[in-house]
A protein has these predicted regions:
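Hydrophobic alpha-helical membrane segments
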Residues: 1-328
Length: 328
């Protein structure tokens, strides 16, 4: 059973503090390019995840448009920035395997369930979720402060009011400024936290500290990275959120590459790559269904034989782990 100490600080034996590199704008754009390379090399799972969030974005817009919650459409959409680093944990695992020259299957993303840092990752995810909830609460307070108990009841009158009145523009300006503060906080504490926890089994506190040290050492690069993420999300949201099907996975892979540039590697403390999931895990009906679906997508894309989850031993047959073509 994982101790509370492990969740917050990592293994007691771990004494190496992650060393921060100095990076610049070129590193940000290089990380984005490498993220694109990862996406095109491994498109199946990212497209599946991206489409899920595109649909989620449309659903959020619909829920806020046909009720008395249109004013929360922007804060909810901005939540992608706040919780995105946690959601992309499976994409980090794919990029981690690819950089080591391993063949990557979509179902390999489920091996994060066996990561020794999983409790710390979940705890950090809850922290980001709390920041997101605080942002939504602040947005509601700003709206009530400006519009009182009788706001426009429908979406069209609300949009007309926002774009043509003083209180509407005040809502936009104040809302954007407050949202920027929440986004800056989330970026500063999580810019490399999740990849670092996955890679080295660090606890919540040292991972948060490492992100803050990266931010202090490279304020311009981190600010540029945040701007790239925000701009990409805005562009991805414009065509009815469908652009997020590409933007979110690319940003997930690029975040892993950014982490590699911002933190020096320490092979002695890196967590070994996991093999196939234990049969007890794949016997879980929900996980088994996800496994089969992801494996089927790989079969359709690559033409390889799907993983056999019904082997007599109960253990999924291991795929031969082959280096990528051109891998060192």
């Amino acid at each position: 059973m994982t101790s509370v100490f492990h969740v917050y600080f990592g293994p007691e034996a771990l004494t190496a503090t992650p060393r921060v590199r100095h990076i610049g704008p070129d590193d940000c754009f290089s990380a984005l390019k490498e993220g694109l390379d990862d996406f095109f090399a491994m498109p199946t799972y990212p497209i599946f995840v991206g489409l899920f969030y595109a649909v989620a974005g449309i659903a959020l817009f619909a829920m806020t448009s046909f009720g008395n919650a249109m004013h929360l459409a922007f804060p909810l959409a901005a939540g992608f920035v706040l919780i995105g680093p946690f959601v992309a944990i499976g994409l980090y695992e794919m990029s981690r395997r690819r950089e080591r020259g391993l063949a990557v299957a979509s179902s390999d993303t489920l091996t994060v369930l066996r990561s020794p840092a999983l409790p710390s990752i979940l705890a950090f995810g809850l922290l980001l979720l709390a920041i997101f909830a605080a942002w939504i609460f602040a947005a509601e307070l700003i709206y009530v402060w400006l519009y009182g108990p009788n706001p426009p009841a429908a979406a069209i009158p609300f949009l007309q009011d926002v774009l043509s009145t003083g209180r509407g523009w005040t809502l936009i300006v104040v809302g954007v400024l407050v949202g920027f503060c929440f986004a800056a906080l989330a970026l500063a504490i999580s810019v490399v936290s999740f990849p670092l926890m996955l890679d080295r089994d660090l606890g919540l506190v040292p991972a948060l500290d490492a992100s803050l040290r990266v931010t202090r050492a490279n304020p311009l690069a981190v600010a540029l990275w945040g701007l790239i993420v925000a701009a990409a999300l805005v562009l991805g949201s414009l065509p009815l959120f469908f652009g997020l099907a590409v933007v979110l996975p690319v940003l997930g892979h690029a975040t892993w590459r950014f982490y590699r540039k911002a933190i020096e590697r320490d092979p002695a403390h890196e967590v070994p790559i996991e093999g196939p999931l234990h049969p007890d895990v794949t016997k879980n009906p929900a996980l088994r269904l996800v496994w089969i679906f992801l494996d089927a997508l790989d079969y359709l894309r690559q033409g390889r034989e799907p993983t056999d989850l019904n082997a007599s031993s109960g253990e999924p047959k291991s795929r031969a782990t082959k280096p990528r073509a051109g891998a060192p």
